[in-house]
Amino acid sequence: MSIAFLLPGQGSQFPGMLHQLLDHPEVKRTLDEVSSMLHSDVRDIDSEEALQSTVSVQIALLTAGVATARALIQEDVEPAVVCGLSVGAFAAAVVADVLSLKDALELVELRAERMTKLYPTGYGLSAIVGLTGPQVLKIVQAATSDREPVFVANINAPRQIVIAGSDTGMDRVLDQARSQGATKAERLHVSVPSHCPLLQPVADCLQRRLSSVQLRNPKMTYVGNINARAMRTAELVASDLANNIAHGVRWHDATTVAKELGCNLFLEMPPGHVLSDLAKENLAGVSAFAVEQDSLPRVLRFAKQDESRLIPEPPHVAGST
């Protein structure tokens, strides 16, 4: 059985997420390691109030993803492929040993600070479910303007598209999407316009910072956000990490590549279950699980080929990323 680790991005966070991670020595070690780097307890940043901050959200996501991945690897559940969505790509790079956790933490903090400073209010992300990419693109092209820009950001599934841009521009797109039959068209819990040209200055800043960071070639295959390519060199991974913030994410294509590389078990690191839902719904013949506290024994049994003891669960309805 070949395994892919999926690491989620902003929008999947929820209050208490770090307190609900696996009860495992590697998780505790990682939480303590991050706390030492921050000079404060990282567990304090998962309150409802703290998660209003983009910086806190992205640090929490990095921490949760790396901590859980380390716990699984300690239990001999080793990924052949890592795929991280948006800021989840930094956690994927740590799991693949391209970046140290310390460098990833500094980069994620810089990324979040620059994103917030560039667009503190009036912008964000929205999800449209039930329309195709070309349908959404046509609506976006009709609605966007220089003063109220909107862009197609992420292709999460053939009929699950994320848009980025100004609040007013996105409202026009969402209204039109509903009128054209979208089953869901709603704002996400993301207050910056990620994955579009508006954030090119952030990408440039990250590129400069990454040029001074010690990088290593990935220990397993890293699949990129921008072009959904399998990457096996540090330079390619670094380019994807820096530039995905200013480009659309081809998530569906990325997970399809993981399947084509032989992965038939997709494990989503906390928080949430959206990415594993997408895999179950859109990748025929694969199994997918969200690795949560109560699911760890099931995941370990399945990953170690004891499929006879697995009790199937119905797929969740995916909503946002």
Q: What are the residue ranges of the model-derived segments?
A:
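A short, acidic, amphipathic alpha-helical segment used as a generic capping/interface helix at domain edges
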Residues: 246-263
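FabD-like malonyl-/acyl-CoA
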Residues: 1-137, 265-298
